Amino acid sequence: MLSPKRTRFRKQHRGRMKGISYRGNRICFGRYALQALEPAWITSRQIEAGRRAMTRNARRGGKIWVRIFPDKPVTVRPAETRMGSGKGSPEYWVAVVKPGRILYEISGVAENIARRAVAIAASKMPIRTQFIISG
Protein backbone atom coordinates (compact mmCIF):
# COMPACT_ATOMS: atom_id res chain seq x y z
CA MET A 1 0.00 0.00 0.00
CA LEU A 2 1.06 3.55 -0.68
CA SER A 3 2.37 5.85 2.03
CA PRO A 4 5.03 8.58 2.22
CA LYS A 5 8.57 7.45 3.05
CA ARG A 6 8.95 10.26 5.56
CA THR A 7 6.99 13.39 6.48
CA ARG A 8 7.88 16.61 8.19
CA PHE A 9 5.15 16.22 10.82
CA ARG A 10 3.49 13.06 12.16
CA LYS A 11 -0.03 14.48 12.53
CA GLN A 12 -2.15 16.84 10.41
CA HIS A 13 -5.32 18.86 10.78
CA ARG A 14 -8.34 17.39 9.06
CA GLY A 15 -8.88 20.41 6.81
CA ARG A 16 -11.86 20.77 4.50
CA MET A 17 -12.53 19.95 0.86
CA LYS A 18 -13.87 23.09 -0.78
CA GLY A 19 -14.37 23.65 -4.48
CA ILE A 20 -13.10 21.64 -7.43
CA SER A 21 -9.73 20.22 -8.37
CA TYR A 22 -7.67 22.61 -10.50
CA ARG A 23 -4.64 20.31 -10.57
CA GLY A 24 -4.61 16.75 -11.83
CA ASN A 25 -7.92 17.15 -13.64
CA ARG A 26 -6.70 16.43 -17.20
CA ILE A 27 -5.57 13.16 -18.79
CA CYS A 28 -1.77 13.29 -19.00
CA PHE A 29 -0.43 9.78 -19.60
CA GLY A 30 -3.07 7.33 -20.81
CA ARG A 31 -5.96 7.28 -23.27
CA TYR A 32 -8.80 6.54 -20.83
CA ALA A 33 -9.27 7.68 -17.25
CA LEU A 34 -11.43 7.53 -14.12
CA GLN A 35 -12.47 10.96 -12.84
CA ALA A 36 -13.90 11.78 -9.40
CA LEU A 37 -17.25 13.60 -9.26
CA GLU A 38 -17.45 14.08 -5.48
CA PRO A 39 -15.03 15.18 -2.75
CA ALA A 40 -13.68 12.47 -0.44
CA TRP A 41 -10.75 11.02 1.43
CA ILE A 42 -9.60 7.91 -0.43
CA THR A 43 -7.53 5.53 1.67
CA SER A 44 -4.38 3.79 0.49
CA ARG A 45 -6.25 0.46 0.76
CA GLN A 46 -8.99 1.68 -1.60
CA ILE A 47 -6.39 3.00 -4.07
CA GLU A 48 -4.58 -0.35 -4.02
CA ALA A 49 -7.83 -2.32 -4.40
CA GLY A 50 -8.76 -0.25 -7.46
CA ARG A 51 -5.30 -0.64 -8.98
CA ARG A 52 -5.35 -4.42 -8.48
CA ALA A 53 -8.82 -4.70 -10.00
CA MET A 54 -7.71 -2.74 -13.08
CA THR A 55 -4.50 -4.73 -13.60
CA ARG A 56 -6.34 -8.05 -13.24
CA ASN A 57 -9.00 -6.96 -15.71
CA ALA A 58 -6.67 -5.46 -18.30
CA ARG A 59 -4.50 -8.60 -18.08
CA ARG A 60 -1.12 -8.50 -19.84
CA GLY A 61 -1.93 -5.64 -22.20
CA GLY A 62 -2.05 -2.02 -21.21
CA LYS A 63 -0.33 0.34 -18.82
CA ILE A 64 -1.96 1.83 -15.73
CA TRP A 65 -1.11 5.07 -13.93
CA VAL A 66 -2.30 5.91 -10.41
CA ARG A 67 -2.68 9.69 -10.33
CA ILE A 68 -3.37 10.14 -6.60
CA PHE A 69 -1.09 9.56 -3.62
CA PRO A 70 -2.12 9.19 0.04
CA ASP A 71 -0.05 11.84 1.81
CA LYS A 72 -2.39 12.76 4.68
CA PRO A 73 -2.19 10.80 7.96
CA VAL A 74 -5.48 10.07 9.71
CA THR A 75 -5.33 9.64 13.47
CA VAL A 76 -7.63 7.36 15.44
CA ARG A 77 -8.10 7.19 19.20
CA PRO A 78 -8.27 3.78 20.87
CA ALA A 79 -11.76 2.46 21.63
CA GLU A 80 -13.28 3.33 25.03
CA THR A 81 -10.77 6.09 25.74
CA ARG A 82 -11.79 9.14 27.75
CA MET A 83 -11.70 12.59 26.21
CA GLY A 84 -8.51 14.59 26.44
CA SER A 85 -4.92 13.34 26.68
CA GLY A 86 -3.97 14.51 23.22
CA LYS A 87 -4.62 13.52 19.64
CA GLY A 88 -4.74 9.85 18.60
CA SER A 89 -1.92 8.03 16.82
CA PRO A 90 -1.68 7.96 12.99
CA GLU A 91 -3.54 4.88 11.81
CA TYR A 92 -3.73 5.07 8.01
CA TRP A 93 -3.06 7.36 5.03
CA VAL A 94 -5.55 9.09 2.74
CA ALA A 95 -5.47 11.06 -0.49
CA VAL A 96 -7.65 14.19 -0.45
CA VAL A 97 -9.70 14.06 -3.67
CA LYS A 98 -11.83 16.92 -4.96
CA PRO A 99 -14.36 16.76 -7.82
CA GLY A 100 -12.67 16.66 -11.23
CA ARG A 101 -9.54 14.85 -10.06
CA ILE A 102 -8.22 12.01 -12.24
CA LEU A 103 -7.75 8.88 -10.14
CA TYR A 104 -6.45 6.31 -12.64
CA GLU A 105 -5.37 6.32 -16.27
CA ILE A 106 -5.04 3.39 -18.64
CA SER A 107 -3.79 2.93 -22.21
CA GLY A 108 -2.72 0.17 -24.57
CA VAL A 109 -6.07 -1.65 -24.44
CA ALA A 110 -9.31 -1.52 -26.43
CA GLU A 111 -12.01 0.87 -25.22
CA ASN A 112 -14.43 -1.88 -24.13
CA ILE A 113 -11.71 -3.55 -22.01
CA ALA A 114 -10.72 -0.17 -20.54
CA ARG A 115 -14.37 0.61 -19.71
CA ARG A 116 -14.78 -2.74 -17.96
CA ALA A 117 -11.52 -2.40 -15.99
CA VAL A 118 -12.33 1.18 -14.96
CA ALA A 119 -15.90 0.23 -13.96
CA ILE A 120 -14.56 -2.45 -11.61
CA ALA A 121 -12.04 0.01 -10.13
CA ALA A 122 -14.85 2.58 -9.75
CA SER A 123 -16.88 0.10 -7.68
CA LYS A 124 -14.01 0.02 -5.16
CA MET A 125 -14.14 3.81 -4.71
CA PRO A 126 -16.33 5.46 -2.04
CA ILE A 127 -17.48 8.19 -4.46
CA ARG A 128 -19.30 8.66 -7.77
CA THR A 129 -16.90 8.69 -10.72
CA GLN A 130 -16.99 8.90 -14.50
CA PHE A 131 -15.08 7.26 -17.36
CA ILE A 132 -13.43 9.78 -19.68
CA ILE A 133 -11.51 9.53 -22.96
CA SER A 134 -8.65 11.89 -23.88
CA GLY A 135 -8.95 14.20 -26.84
From Swiss-Prot:
Keywords from the named record: Chloroplast, Methylation, Plastid, Ribonucleoprotein, Ribosomal protein
GO molecular function: rRNA binding; structural constituent of ribosome
Gene Ontology biological process terms in this record: mitochondrial translation
Record carries keyword Ribosomal protein: yes
Top-level taxon in the UniProt lineage: Eukaryota
Protein purpose: Component of the chloroplast ribosome (chloro-ribosome), a dedicated translation machinery responsible for the synthesis of chloroplast genome-encoded proteins, including proteins of the transcription and translation machinery and components of the photosynthetic apparatus.
Protein's recorded name: Large ribosomal subunit protein uL16c
Originating gene: rpl16
